[in-house]
From Swiss-Prot:
Cofactor binding mode and count: Binds 1 pyruvoyl group covalently per subunit.
Residues bearing the modification Pyruvic acid (Ser): S64
Any one GO MF annotation of this record: adenosylmethionine decarboxylase activity
Primary role: Catalyzes the decarboxylation of S-adenosylmethionine to S-adenosylmethioninamine (dcAdoMet), the propylamine donor required for the synthesis of the polyamines spermine and spermidine from the diamine putrescine.
Record-linked InterPro entries: AdoMetDC_fam_prok, S-AdoMet_deCO2ase_core, S-AdoMet_deCOase_pro-enz
Organism: Hydrogenobaculum sp. (strain Y04AAS1)
GO CC terms, sorted: cytosol
Name this polypeptide is given: S-adenosylmethionine decarboxylase proenzyme
Subunit structure: Heterotetramer of two alpha and two beta chains arranged as a dimer of alpha/beta heterodimers.
Site residues, Cleavage (non-hydrolytic): E63, S64
Family to which the UniProt record says this protein belongs: Belongs to the prokaryotic AdoMetDC family. Type 1 subfamily.
Associated pathway: Amine and polyamine biosynthesis; S-adenosylmethioninamine biosynthesis; S-adenosylmethioninamine from S-adenosyl-L-methionine: step 1/1
Keyword check for Lyase: yes
Amino acid sequence: MAKTLGLHIIADLYGVNPDLIDREEDIRHLLENSVKAGELTKISSHFYQFNPHGATGVILLAESHISIHTWPEHKTATVDVFTCGDPSKAYRAMDYIINSLSPTHVDKKVFDRGIIEDSKGKDVLWIMSKAGCC
């Protein structure tokens, strides 16, 4: 099994109650609580309220980041959770967001990021460079 530097979960949430994703303060509260649920370490954050509706926000983590972008007029939110270290933290943070917003449909993808070793402990980048592909 490959060793990776991090886990990246992206999700498109459809059928979200627009009242839950329209205001900056609501998504701020949502992301702050997802950091707690994932037992992650917040470094800083930035949120922005769009006019007439919708908001966006990002929390910079010691482990990487969590972000959300909302379109209440389409009942849609896109969420991004990327962490290094314990992958269960990313899953817990994302699960908190999904459970809090109760979408009718979720399109979620999970990516291993920064593959650094193969199952035998060999450096993948070294192997790829010797093969002439990097």
